[in-house]
């Protein structure tokens, strides 16, 4: 089955789940009894409004609204395209991401935004970009037509989410797809099972862009700074707590790779594990400002957006290492931001070194790490066993933090990871350079 057909089928599933109000993720099986958590998989590719020629060659057939004269092609046509985008369930309704040609163009827009009926939710001159909310599409179209030459590109605020874990193949339903669980042995595969790691991560801030981190015994001695960008007042999804524990947990079986790390908890996704690229890009920039040296993003979207790409490239330019989950959709392409060259993308393997059946693969995959049956902390003080590229990414972020604290320069870390990776003989599209191991 090709990737496009998989996307189409998955979109149908997503729309059904949206209509039933059962969005969620299935990356964890709790060790306590409870209702099964629903699945939220990637939706079909969205036609993002951006220039026809994207920097990585993708999106050549996408609707173009940005290039000055193209924006001015017709108010009615533009209005129709905005309406079609706003009707999609794969975007935040009544929001748009605007990219400008210069800081001056962005500054001028901010001065006239209110008059144009636009609420600026966030803007940053480093990316020459703004996230806006609108109530009247006609007034937004007026702004775009009148000031078209100021814009580099525009597009919807695309949804991004915690990757769900698909059901295993029917023939292997009784043994989790035929995969061998790590449980508490994940660190042993990394080559650090009996090593004194108590100072690993010391002096290193790791930003966790996720669903938020809550109090847990495994994190009670870890310095955690909380930044809530969602601000919805809802309970936190336990996924973020799990990722933080895999990076810096200090308690027995929920122990992390680099327990001396400081965690910067950027909440960019809600209780259902759902966020948007506008918030994630904002979180990346604020994490850089806060002194993060590593950014873990165990979230993904199938849609390549210029704002998210620019944010990770900015982080890289500042010497910050971004690590992201490859995705759990069994596809031959990576989710974003893992799909960007500036990101250390991570696939999942089981305890026998085999690629997990759910793990995405594709060109540019950097490395693989334990991602099947991983023990971690969870909300409300619970311990869970979960599977996914989310866990693999978090373990890799912990490894990066450990290397930085051991005085490896950030520019050398990718090379160190590839040189020390365990070669399995599997194609690079499945495991990248191999399975993560630390020197």
PLM regions: where:
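Catalytic-core segments of hydrolase enzymes
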Residues: 292-379, 416-421
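Hydrolase catalytic cores
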Residues: 246-247, 268-269, 371-436
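C-terminal subdomain of the subtilisin-like protease fold in secreted/lumenal serine endopeptidases
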Residues: 5, 37-40, 45-46, 288-297, ...
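Short pre-catalytic strand/loop immediately N-terminal to key active-site residues, enriched for Gly-Thr
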Residues: 227-236, 355, 379-391
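Protease zymogen maturation seam
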Residues: 149-205, 217-218, 430-432
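Substrate-binding/charge-relay-adjacent region of secreted/lumenal peptidase catalytic domains
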Residues: 245, 274-294
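Subtilisin-like serine protease catalytic core
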Residues: 194-206, 211-225, 231-278, 340-342, ...
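Primarily auto-inhibitory N-terminal propeptides
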Residues: 6-172
């Amino acid at each position: 089955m090709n990737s496009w057909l998989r996307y189409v089928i998955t979109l149908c599933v997503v729309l059904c789940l949206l209509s039933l109000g059962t969005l969620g993720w299935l990356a964890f099986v709790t060790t306590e009894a409870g209702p099964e958590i629903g699945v939220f998989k990637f939706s079909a590719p969205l036609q993002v409004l951006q220039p026809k020629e994207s920097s990585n060659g993708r999106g050549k057939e996408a609707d173009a609204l940005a290039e000055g004269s193209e924006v001015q092609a017709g108010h009615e046509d533009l209005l129709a395209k905005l309406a079609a985008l706003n009707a999609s369930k794969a975007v935040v309704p009544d929001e748009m991401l605007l990219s400008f040609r210069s800081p001056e163009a962005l500054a001028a827009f901010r001065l006239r935004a209110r008059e144009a009926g636009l609420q600026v939710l966030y803007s940053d001159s480093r990316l020459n970009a703004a996230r806006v909310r609108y109530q009247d599409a006609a007034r937004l179209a007026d702004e775009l037509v009148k000031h078209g030459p100021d814009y580099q590109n525009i597009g919807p605020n695309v949804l991004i989410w915690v990757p769900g874990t698909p059901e295993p193949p029917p023939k292997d339903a009784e043994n989790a797809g035929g995969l061998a669980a790590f449980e508490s042995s994940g660190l042993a595969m990394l080559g650090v099972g009996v090593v004194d790691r108590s100072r690993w991560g010391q002096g290193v801030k790791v930003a966790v862009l996720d669903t938020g981190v809550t109090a847990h015994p495994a994190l009670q001695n870890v310095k955690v700074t909380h930044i809530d960008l969602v601000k919805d007042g809802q309970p936190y999804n336990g996924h973020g707590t799990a990722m933080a524990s895999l990076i810096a947990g200090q308690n027995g079986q929920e122990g992390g790779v680099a327990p001396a790390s400081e965690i910067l908890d950027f909440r960019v996704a809600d209780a259902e594990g759902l966020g948007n690229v506008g918030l994630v890009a904002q979180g990346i920039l604020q994490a850089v400002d806060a002194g993060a040296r590593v950014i873990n993003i165990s979230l993904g979207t199938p849609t390549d957006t210029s704002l998210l790409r620019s944010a990770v490239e900015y982080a890289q330019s500042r010497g910050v290492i971004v690590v992201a989950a490859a995705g759990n959709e069994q596809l031959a392409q990576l989710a974003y931001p893992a799909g960007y060259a500036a990101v250390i993308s991570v696939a999942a393997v089981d305890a026998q070194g085999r690629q997990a059946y759910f793990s995405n693969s594709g060109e540019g995959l950097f490395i693989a790490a334990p991602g099947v049956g991983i023990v971690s902390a969870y909300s409300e003080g619970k311990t869970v066993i979960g599977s996914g590229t989310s866990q693999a990414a978090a373990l890799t972020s912990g490894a990066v933090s450990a290397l930085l604290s051991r005085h490896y320069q950030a520019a050398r870390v990718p090379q160190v990871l590839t040189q020390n990776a365990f070669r399995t003989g599997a194609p690079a599209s499945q495991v990248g350079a191999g399975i993560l191991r630390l020197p």
